């Protein structure tokens, strides 16, 4: 029972650290933001819980820099692929863009 409480507490703290790291990066304190993200990942590895994907996509996997468009990240769309590039280490990640198609034919 104690371990379950600890995991919930540390998961909440990890997500809070990632959000705080984003705010620090916006205020040009990149090194402290990196340390916060490393600490959040350390918690998740140590206590074996997963960080949600929307938080995982907020930082570079190679140098742990929070990714902020125009400051630490460059985004380009090429051939229906979103390319995200970290401006500190050059790490790139590609996401396939899926457009929703609408059927304009109405049944008469």
Curated annotation (Swiss-Prot):
Cofactor(s) essential for the protein: Zn(2+)
Q: What class of enzyme is it?
A: hydrolase
Question: Its GO CC terms?
Answer: cytoplasm; ribonuclease P complex
Residue ranges annotated as transmembrane are none
Q: Any note on cofactor binding?
A: Binds 1 zinc ion per subunit.
Give residues annotated as binding Zn(2+): 60, 63, 86, 89
Q: Name one GO biological process term.
A: tRNA 5'-leader removal
| InterPro entries (UniProt xref) | RNP4, Rpr2/Snm1/Rpp21
EC number(s) recorded for this UniProt protein: 3.1.26.5
Give yes or no: UniProt keyword Transport. Answer: no
Q: Which UniProt keywords apply?
A: Cytoplasm, Endonuclease, Hydrolase, Metal-binding, Nuclease, tRNA processing, Zinc
- Domain of life of the organism encoding this protein: Archaea
Q: Which reaction does it catalyse?
A: Endonucleolytic cleavage of RNA, removing 5'-extranucleotides from tRNA precursor
Q: Where in the cell is it found?
A: Cytoplasm
In terms of one coarse class, where is the protein primarily found? Answer: cytoplasm
* Similarity annotation: Belongs to the eukaryotic/archaeal RNase P protein component 4 family.
Q: What this chain does, per the record?
A: Part of ribonuclease P, a protein complex that generates mature tRNA molecules by cleaving their 5'-ends.
Under the subunit heading, UniProt states: Consists of a catalytic RNA component and at least 4-5 protein subunits.
What PANTHER family does the database record attribute to this sequence? Answer: RIBONUCLEASE P PROTEIN SUBUNIT P21 (PTHR14742:SF0), RIBONUCLEASE P SUBUNIT P21 (PTHR14742)
Q: HAMAP family annotated for this entry?
A: RNase_P_4 (MF_00757)
Q: What is this protein called?
A: Ribonuclease P protein component 4
Q: Give the source species.
A: Sulfurisphaera tokodaii (strain DSM 16993 / JCM 10545 / NBRC 100140 / 7) (Sulfolobus tokodaii)
